[in-house]
Amino acid sequence: SDVYKRQRLAIHDLAVMLDVAETEVANEIADMEKEHIICGYHTLINWDNTSKDQLTAMIEVKVTPQRGQGFDRIAERIYNFPEVKAVYLMSGGYDFMVMLEGKTMKEISMFTSSKLAPLESVVSTVTHFVLKKYKDHGTVLEAKKVDERQAVTP
């Protein structure tokens, strides 16, 4: 919905869109934050348009689940590393998809080899580096370029 995509709408604008009082919108947002339905607010940055070096990696991680705790305990150990931006339990050929950001491939490689791979339950890792982002969180990151070339006809 439009509300989900445009989370920076003012309470007044949300109230108008939903045809309810502003206090009702404010109270509902506060309740959803308390209940952890709304978990945070994020700014989406296209790092390619800045002078800052930023590299995103996705790491496939195979683990051995721990008795009585399944995947939850190892997931917690992984997501508590400050470098880690996201951890997902996956179906298919591996167990977790770990997303992290760093300045260089070496920095990410060092994290994987010195912190992630040595964890007790980790069986293997495969690292993929993002070369270019075209769309992120529903937002196209590059403006369409108009082809200004003229057609040549014989």
Language model region names:
Residues 1-154:
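A compositional/biophysical signature of low hydrophobicity enriched in polar/charged and small residues
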